[in-house]
Curated annotation (Swiss-Prot):
Annotated compartments: Cytoplasm
Function: Bidirectionally degrades single-stranded DNA into large acid-insoluble oligonucleotides, which are then degraded further into small acid-soluble oligonucleotides.
Protein name: Exodeoxyribonuclease 7 small subunit
Lineage: Bacteria, Pseudomonadati, Pseudomonadota, Gammaproteobacteria, Alteromonadales
Gene: xseB
Organism: Colwellia psychrerythraea (strain 34H / ATCC BAA-681)
Single biological process term from Gene Ontology: DNA catabolic process
Subunit structure: Heterooligomer composed of large and small subunits.
Chief localization: cytoplasm
Enzyme superclass (EC): hydrolase
Length: 82
């Protein structure tokens, strides 16, 4: 699989590539240099996935029913925290 630029990867593509990298590293058949290159790519993919997940979380809308009227409200990630 040709490596796409990180910014062009979807969330699912980044997770799939990250999974492939983990499997390759766990096999232990790579040189140190190859392992370090994959490890660095994996870290970047992990960070990208986290950013994309946070962006999606911010866009989530919750359907609230107030006084019998449906209303869309932006997701508030701090609403359940004490």
């Amino acid at each position: 699989m040709a490596k796409k630029k990180l910014e062009n990867l979807s969330f699912e593509e980044s997770l799939n590539e990250l999974d492939t990298i983990v499997q390759s590293l766990e096999q232990g058949e790579l040189s140190l240099e190859e392992s370090m290159t994959l490890f660095e790519r994996g870290l970047n993919l992990s960070q990208l996935s986290q950013v994309k997940l946070q962006a999606a979380e911010q866009k989530v809308q919750i359907l609230l029913d107030k006084n019998g009227t449906a209303k869309l409200t932006d997701f508030d990630s701090s609403a359940g925290e004490s």
